[in-house]
């Protein structure tokens, strides 16, 4: 059976010191080898940094945001978030209350025919 095509991208934005890139990549490398990505439907992840900002691009068959509440208390999700908490901070801590608050809004898409 062919793989289901990627139909949704989520971009998470936060703050991260460039010196933490390796540690953050290692945390995701470990997690991505387990079940958490499949629990959320994630099929690809790319991490970027730029002048103290952290960009986390997730590709999935469906929007991952609705699945977050069901996995937020799962030990695998808690473990990743605890480890990342040492390296990543909210873009705007005063307005952040959940992962959804860090998700960028897509306002334009183009694709070749």
What is each of the regions a protein language model found here?
Residues 16-43:
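Short amphipathic alpha-helical segments
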Residues 3-18:
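Short glycine-/aliphatic-rich beta-strand segments at the starts of folded cytosolic domains
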Residues 91-113:
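Short, low-order "capping/linker" segments at domain edges
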Residues 11-14, 43-72:
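Short, well-ordered beta-strand segments in beta-rich or mixed alpha/beta enzyme
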Residues 33-42, 61-98:
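An amphipathic, aromatic/His-enriched active-site/gating alpha helix that lines ligand/cofactor pockets
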Residues 2-4, 39, 46-48:
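Short, conserved, surface-exposed binding loops centered on an aromatic residue
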Residues 15, 86, 112-113:
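A compositional/biophysical signature of low hydrophobicity enriched in polar/charged and small residues
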